[in-house]
Amino acid sequence: MVDERLKQAFLVLLRQGLWGKKEVEQTDFPLTPDEWTQIYEMAVKQTVQGIIYDGISFLPKEQQPPRGLLIQWTVAIDQLERMNRRQNKLLGILPQIFGQEPAIPFQLLKGQGIAAFYPKPMHRLCGDIDLYFGNETQTEKANQRIESLGVRVERGQLGDSSYALNGIEIEHHKRLIDLYRPSVRKAVDCWEAEQFAKRTLVPSPIANHLLQSTHILKHLLLQGIGLRQFCDLAVTLKAQVAGIDRQELEEICRTWKIGKWQQVIYALIVQYLGFPEEELPMKTHENPAPLMEEVWQTGNFGHGDERFGNRPDGFWKGKAHTLRVMLNKWRLSFRYAPQEISWYLTDLARKRIKELFTHESN
């Protein structure tokens, strides 16, 4: 368990790296060598090691990490920069592939498009490349275009697909927004079609914002979330908030019933990441502490969550363990998006009952 003082020191470094400026108060420093090791481990867990590294540069030299750890960190950042350069190079090739006649329009989601908003874009940890093709038909055409190059494409159950190109994972998506309950999906589909028809290389500011916020909700529900996703949300919103129609955003949040979720993530980026409250697209009075505690516990994709131990062997034991983990996530998620969670649980129960009957028959 990380103590509160170390969390506050971590957040100071994170804010300094995120916004590229020194904080006035740095009362939690200096740190001991062991505490610096914990800071590094926390950064890896939250996948913000590049941002924390940048934040360290604003500390006096005598307060920076021990030389050995700093060298290790610098090597990791050098590798991160190399990864980003590889991705940027591949991004220059993709328009050539999909631009061949008949052209297949796409939008770049998240990733390198978001990195451009950071003070040091090359220090954002890059994942896979996400491409959005507007609908299922166009996504399948894109899949076939890639297969024509001799590349194997894996198709998922929800209509998404993935493959590796030049050693980099790429995903194709037929949808932009991660909301799935039938009562709003038709409205979301129509809105997505309107957005995609604008034929921009990246989503519009409001589409980008809603993509990120609903994607974070999905990760909270299914896996776990790290601070990197909130950093992405904060720097993107800071750069694009002037292009967001606040009345349109509020209407969408009412229709999709995600207003409370939007408000709690706004509260989180203000209280912990230093986003200027006066620049929020809507006011918030939500308490972000429970959500932030979940972020501390789970880390990126939930890989750092140690609360429930490893999944045990055996079909039923494994299912029971998964249920314990998911119930914890659902309780928290239900506070912020009850309609989405209720539908998800109903749909999941239907699928699991079918799965159990299949298991028993085998």
Predicted regions and their residues:
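Conserved NTP-donor binding/palm subdomain of two-metal-ion nucleotidyltransferases/polymerases, i.e.
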Residues: 1-127, 133-362
